[in-house]
């Protein structure tokens, strides 16, 4: 289970068309807001700096951290692994878990998706399976071997093309091997959770919940939900149905055991399910930052993804928007800076005014990359920062669509003190329905769309009838 950061995705999607700022220490919106803050928050474990830089900050809830570590230590006692290990919750809204060094991490986004302690044990056990079998080291050695072979092939044949071919084929084989590692980690994690006294079907129900969440994410993007069960030859993970099928033949998968659902729900009750305030909040198709006091509104069909590096917006027609801010000094006009510093140099550069502030708008030079559609760059001065949008539209409707994206960039504005003060993270609450129907519970959610679908996915059920059978229900409150 590996989560991806936004910047590599931006480089892949935008390529040379991205509005690339000079590399002399730019500061993102999130890092600007968080500048000067200490490494550890109250209640959060202090991680080694190099590990926190890689995985993200820990969540500031001492009781929840202790609870998760306690479940992990219970599994570790069954694993027979030497050394000491820590289990920690990361302050990230995405659903994920992974292991690094002597740490096993779960995100609060994953905790929100799970239904009981047994499923948490399944997630932690899966990652202990990776650690116990030294999968990370195996992959690193295998990857280096592939790269060495590629270099040797290029030298012997005198052909860089041959070297690239060897590297490509070898890395694909390595990815296939990675799928075997995932299935092995499922088996080992299953054995651990059963020996620790948890229900054996928790591994399957964990995978099924992650599958449902992935299907819902695809639905939000207008994609086919069943595509989550299809994988290509280049996939780094087995498809969920492949993992579920592999578990069916293992007797332990049906072993009885504890769920500890009440204790689990009590531990996550009140947990944030939102972005951290220093990174701003996504509210439907709006981005609002309470510390920088800025915001903008994307087109209605856009899905926004927030990250410490910036905000990525993806439209149903695969149009793209990327937003961030920098404290890099930009003397003179923004139009002049854009003309002299951005490469390739934009065309049709216009000075503009957005939110009563200086702005500049430019276009990608025609012919600079025929593989891309319409690209626009929008820069706005905001106090001692410059905020910028990279906009991309492809397809037959790209000319009209790019103007829609520019109009979205023009919604950039400064939030009032009252607006900023009113912004708080959404939180998970565990409630007793007390006769409230699924429709009534769904209507209370603070989202503008897919209310029922969100409620069902959050509780890991397929329909309202299944939800009605739950004695306690998870919901989201502002």
Language-model regions: role of each:
Residues 15-18:
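C-terminal motif of bacterial Sec signal peptides marking the signal peptidase cleavage site
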Residues 322, 339-388, 392:
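Signature of long, low-cysteine stretches enriched in small and polar/charged residues
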Residues 273-306:
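N-terminal "mature-domain start" segment
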Residues 20-157, 171-174, 191-207, 212-228, ...:
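Peri-catalytic and regulatory segments of divalent metal-dependent proteins
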Residues 419-449:
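Primarily a LysM-type cell-wall glycan-binding module
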Residues 451-478:
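Extracellular LysM carbohydrate-binding repeats and other cell-envelope/extracellular binding modules
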Residues 121, 254, 389-429:
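Surface-exposed amphipathic alpha-helical segments
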Residues 295-342:
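Secretory pathway targeting signatures of secreted, lumenal, and periplasmic proteins
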